[in-house]
């Protein structure tokens, strides 16, 4: 029986899921014997495991709930902004083999590590600070999405958005702080299965059954929700997504964590392919909610982020509702844990150890667990201030994409890139992005566009002017 509200069984299923995630983290902690285990899982992951974690992570709370909310309010924009990220990820999967080779041959474990070996410690710290800021913002977007779901339970058991955010942080902290990337990867595989079965198959299929078939959906679809269009804001989002894929710290970490070059390329490619198949389904869930969920219910939740869980509650019977909401939580948590582990690595390995290079490994492991507690609290503050997952994500990514995307690509491939060029590019990209936002984004153009252009100009011109007098070390994994 469809019930239009949450039943005790649904709540029990959601609670059991959250407990299972914590237990996985506590069990897998036994595998963590070194920092290489904590950060990279011992470089031991094959293509299928990487496929699951890549797909689950890049969808995320903002990619599912946030983008479905965009589809609900703006229709085809949800697809227009997803396709550049998909294209960028396919391109990145082609780079993943080289990244894996560089990591294995030169002992590189992160993008800042690569920057240090090519451009020195200053470049490493600057990039590390950019990554830490971006990852915290991304974790905050997942806290917001999780809190939105838990807040939807508030009418049943009295949990507010704020308390939901605290619960989300607590779960993220426990299994990430204890088990590192091992815990992240193994929970991601479980979460991937939950996501595909109970979100991307169950909810769309049940929606069509409820409507009486695809014909009725098309007949009642508002034309403006299916009409492609583009404006300056969408262009900004497109550039942000595309450039971000070149320097997404979590994506580089997956390549470094692969057991070999082939696993890195295949895992990234298959995960991206699986993600691509979900894009039209997210749009469908966003727009079909207009036909199945009363508008006042969406409005009552206070955010269009609530569209997909509201749809699940509206159309699914007892038990399946709990599984669907657990599936939605799974994709959010998959993204949060991946970005959290990257932010922890950045703060401890890429920033702290620059100033304390002789830190013993045992102390470094303790510090990672301290930061795995502290950083989510910073994300919590952001989530309490900005309660829209998509807005938080685009705010954080715009700065990073403009300032770090092209320098990261240059560090991997361009022999003539120099320390001065990379630092100039990052400074120009970050500064112009801030200035453009402060000016109110003239012409309606997203800030990443002028920021990325400024970064490219500074990077290329300064590097060409300084490469002869101050060449950088080029890391070529093909040379013995």
Predicted regions: what they are:
Residues 1-480:
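Membrane-embedded helix-loop-helix hairpins and adjacent transmembrane boundary segments
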């Amino acid at each position: 029986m469809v019930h239009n509200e949450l039943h005790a069984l649904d709540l029990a299923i959601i609670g059991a899921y959250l407990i299972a995630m914590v237990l996985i983290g506590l069990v897998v902690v036994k595998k963590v014997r070194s920092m290489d285990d904590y950060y990279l899982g011992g470089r031991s992951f094959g293509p299928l495991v990487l496929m699951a974690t890549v797909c689950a992570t890049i969808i995320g709370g903002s990619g599912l709930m946030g983008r479905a909310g965009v589809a609900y309010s703006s229709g085809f924009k949800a697809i227009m902004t997803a396709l550049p990220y998909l294209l960028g990820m396919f391109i990145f999967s082609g780079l993943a083999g080289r990244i894996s080779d560089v990591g294995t041959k030169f002992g590189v474990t992160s993008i800042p590590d690569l920057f240090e070996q090519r451009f020195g410690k200053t470049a490493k710290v600057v990039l590390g600070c950019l990554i830490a800021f971006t990852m915290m913002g991304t974790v905050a977007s997942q806290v917001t999405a999780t809190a939105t779901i838990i807040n939807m339970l508030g009418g049943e058991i009295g949990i507010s958005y704020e308390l939901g955010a605290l619960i989300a942080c607590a779960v993220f902290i426990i299994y990430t702080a204890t088990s590192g990337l091992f815990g992240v990867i193994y929970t991601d595989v479980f979460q991937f299965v939950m996501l595909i079965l109970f979100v991307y198959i169950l909810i769309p299929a049940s929606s069509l059954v409820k409507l009486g078939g695809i014909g009725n959906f098309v007949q009642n679809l508002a034309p403006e929700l299916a009409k492609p269009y583009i404006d300056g804001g969408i262009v900004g989002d497109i550039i942000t997504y595309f450039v971000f894929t070149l320097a997404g710290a979590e994506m580089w970490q997956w390549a470094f964590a692969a057991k070999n070059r082939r696993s890195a390329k295949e895992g990234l490619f298959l995960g991206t392919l699986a993600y691509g198949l979900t894009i039209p389904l997210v749009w469908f869930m966003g727009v079909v909610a207009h036909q199945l969920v009363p508008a006042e219910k969406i409005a009552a939740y206070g955010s269009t982020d609530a569209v997909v869980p509201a749809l699940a509650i509206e159309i699914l019977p007892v038990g399946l509702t709990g599984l669907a909401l657990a599936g939605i939580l799974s994709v959010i948590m998959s993204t949060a844990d991946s970005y959290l582990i990257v932010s922890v690595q950045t703060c401890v390995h890429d920033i702290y150890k620059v100033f304390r290079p002789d830190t013993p490994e045992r102390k470094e492991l303790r510090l990672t667990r301290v930061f795995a507690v502290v950083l989510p609290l910073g994300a919590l503050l952001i989530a309490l201030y900005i309660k829209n997952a998509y807005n938080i994500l685009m705010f954080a990514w715009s700065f990073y994409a403009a300032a770090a995307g092209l320098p990261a690509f240059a560090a991997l491939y361009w022999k003539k890139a120099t320390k001065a060029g990379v630092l100039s590019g990052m400074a120009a990209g970050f500064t112009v992005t801030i200035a453009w936002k402060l000016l109110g984004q003239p012409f309606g153009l997203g800030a990443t566009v002028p920021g990325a252009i400024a970064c490219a100009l500074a990077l290329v011109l300064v590097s060409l002017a300084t490469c002869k007098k101050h060449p950088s070390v080029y890391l070529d994994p093909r040379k013995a």
